[in-house]
Amino acid sequence: MESFNTFVRQYNDQHAEAIAKGELEALAESSSAFIEKASGIKSRFVMNKEGILDPQRMVPYLPERSNDEWSILCEMAVAAAREALQRAGRSAADIDGVIVACSNLQRAYPAIAVEVQAALGIQGYGYDMNVACSSATFGIQAATTAIQTGQARAILMVNPEICTGHLNFRDRDSHFIFGDACTAVIVERADLAVSKHQFDIVSTRLLTQFSNNIRNNFGFLNRADESGIGKRDKLFVQEGRKVFKDVCPMVAELIGEHLAANEIQVAEVKRFWLHQANLNMNLLITRKLLGRDAEAHEAPVILDSYANTSSAGSVIALHKHQDDLPSGAIGVLSSFGAGYSIGSVILRKH
């Protein structure tokens, strides 16, 4: 926040004459009160803070690596994967496929998933997928299908999110939104599972509906039109109020219908692990579902500490808020974001 406010003061000083003439609008400073009221975010973790905190730069500094080194996304994914493997009581030999599902990939090819596969010594196959903030739930659904069809015994689904790489730190409405994180999930045949931390996947449901209200236009064709290079739409941009108005009822409706299709009453759900983008969105979604305000334990919040970590957020919430649930307890893992994209995964504690 201090680097943003320093940038604002420098900008206003440099353009004081134009601002005085009404040719430019003065930029407004940010504040902790504004950020917490708008989002519920109080802190975050980032891969590199020095570059972000430099008012002259305000971009993380992540040096390019040689092709002989593992990429930074691979490095993150491997660290999370090893923790997930240990928690599941599995080794690389037990995994038949790798899905890297995240909101931004650092290169077109070779796939980060294939690199992760090599780094961990996993046989089989790997591929990348991007459904923005819903990448994890869509990845779980893809992994579930692979298990159900006999294509694999177990799938490693991992979400390396360096969200600060596509965040405009000079935009007051979004400079605080994202943090960096990586999560990993192992989906495997129930009859082979040995972990003490198991959940049965009862059902999955996905929905997409096209919208321009959340966009990132960065891509390989940008260089074909130099006039667009460096414009703000090449980073994360959104119409926040429109997103709030559109997405909240869509998520509540999808989860409600998904539960009903599986003959589960909303009141039977012990926990909602929702996408961690905005506290106000989650409060409204659970209020629509429950018909009342959710208790803190019913819809745990981690975005106050981690900020929006895109696809990783709901999985972090699941990881940190599951151990107290008894066997047989029902929970819903749900994500929502750009696309629009919404994923719902009904889980039962083993």
Swiss-Prot record:
GO terms for biological process: fatty acid biosynthetic process; long-chain fatty acid catabolic process; secondary metabolite biosynthetic process. Catalyzes the condensation of octanoyl-CoA, obtained from exogenously supplied fatty acids via beta-oxidation, with malonyl-[acyl-carrier protein], forming 3-oxodecanoyl-[acyl-carrier protein], an intermediate of the fatty acid elongation cycle that can then be extended to supply all of the cellular fatty acid needs. The enzyme thereby shunts fatty acid degradation intermediates from the beta-oxidation pathway into de novo fatty acid biosynthesis. It catalyses: octanoyl-CoA + malonyl-[ACP] + H(+) = 3-oxodecanoyl-[ACP] + CO2 + CoA. This is Beta-ketodecanoyl-[acyl-carrier-protein] synthase. Belongs to the thiolase-like superfamily. Beta-ketoacyl-ACP synthases family. It comes from Pseudomonas aeruginosa (strain ATCC 15692 / DSM 22644 / CIP 104116 / JCM 14847 / LMG 12228 / 1C / PRS 101 / PAO1). Pathway: Lipid metabolism; fatty acid biosynthesis. Keywords: Acyltransferase, Transferase. Pfam families: ACP_syn_III, ACP_syn_III_C. Gene3D superfamilies: 3.40.47.10. Its EC number is 2.3.1.207. The active site is at 133. NCBIfam families: PRK07515.1. One of its GO terms (molecular function) is 3-oxoacyl-[acyl-carrier-protein] synthase activity.
